[in-house]
Amino acid sequence: MLHKFLIAVAVLFSACALYAQKSVSSAVSDIEDDPSNGLEMCRSLFNEYFLSELTTHEKVNMLDTKTVQKALSDLDLSRGRNLTEKEIKNLCAKLKTDALCLVKMSRGAKNAIVITVRIVDNKGKEVGKVTASMKGIGDTDATSHSMARDCAVILRKIRGIVPPKPLAP
């Protein structure tokens, strides 16, 4: 009898803990990227793949591109420069998100495409940065997958959700 009671209590506490862990919400934008660097198509493709990876595979609550673009337009933010802390706060408030994933692309050595995702919280503070390089547009899927996985870990830490450590062999 006591055993059944303890199991019921454990299940109740587990359910409460899961309910209390509100997931992180975020948005992806390339507002800070230089619009004249010739990578528009690649950037657009990467953003959609990256957004899909975060939403589908990493289970992060992400806003759709149209909502983000409307908020950027409403706030009259100009492209190609780093957002200020105040602008980030205002954008997060308008979008009702915990964080932003700000994507930048550039050409690196041997014409590689270097992607940097800067993650900022809704207070405007940078909480992490993930960088990767791809040889061409054909690497978009694999690169977006690995970057989304790394960014999801950083995004979850904003809410205090830390991934479990792997068991020792």
Model-assigned labels for residue ranges:
Residues 1-5:
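Positively charged n-region of N-terminal signal peptides that target proteins for export
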Residues 13-20:
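Sec/Tat signal peptide C-region and signal peptidase I cleavage site
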Residues 21-27, 46-47, 53, 57, ...:
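C-terminal/domain-edge helix-coil "capping" segments
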Residues 25-37, 72-73:
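Acidic/histidine-rich, surface-exposed loop or edge segments in extracytoplasmic proteins
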Residues 31-34, 60, 65-68, 105-108, ...:
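Solvent-exposed coil/turn segments that connect beta secondary-structure elements
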Residues 37-46:
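Glycine- and acidic-residue-enriched helix-capping/strand-helix junction motifs
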Residues 57-102, 108-111:
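Short, solvent-exposed, polar/charged sequence segments at loop or secondary-structure edges
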Residues 115:
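Beta-strand acidic-aromatic groove motif in beta-rich domains, primarily in extracellular
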